[in-house]
Amino acid sequence: MSFASEFKQFIAKGNAMDLAVGVIIGAAFSKIVASIVDDLIMPIVGAVFGGFDFSNLFIALGSVPEGVALTLAEVRKAGVPVLAYGNFVTVLLNFLILALIVFIIVRQINRLKRPAPGAAPAAPPEDIVLLREIRDALRQK
């Protein structure tokens, strides 16, 4: 089997197509989660903490030249190495929200997939019933 035909067979399988669709939807969904965090959650968190913006949190690893504003963009522009942990906090919130949403979706799908409560066992075939009756009649003699 040639490489091209093996590749076609692989792509034609449902699993590969499902994976491709999942990746595309996941990429689009991550933008929705990023918007939820950036546009809805972080402003509320900022309001609770007095207008605090997590994306500008940083620790300067060198001395900041005098006259440079103490914002992340300005300190980076001045060439000072920084630990920008505020962006990490935002990305971490994105991840936690995405993980929670995926967990809820998978949980609901698993609930839908659960088998129905056990059905009553099927009645034994008529010949088995007759054989049991004969056996019981012979035991009584």
From Swiss-Prot:
Its main location: membrane. GO terms for molecular function: mechanosensitive monoatomic ion channel activity. GO terms for cellular component: plasma membrane. The chain crosses the membrane at residues 17-37, 40-60, 86-106. SUPFAM superfamilies: Gated mechanosensitive channel. Keywords: Cell inner membrane, Cell membrane, Ion channel, Ion transport, Membrane, Transmembrane, Transmembrane helix, Transport. InterPro entries: MS_channel (IPR001185), MSC/AndL (IPR037673), MscL_channel (IPR036019). It is a multi-pass membrane protein. It is found in: Cell inner membrane. Channel that opens in response to stretch forces in the membrane lipid bilayer. May participate in the regulation of osmotic pressure changes within the cell. Belongs to the MscL family. Homopentamer. This is Large-conductance mechanosensitive channel.
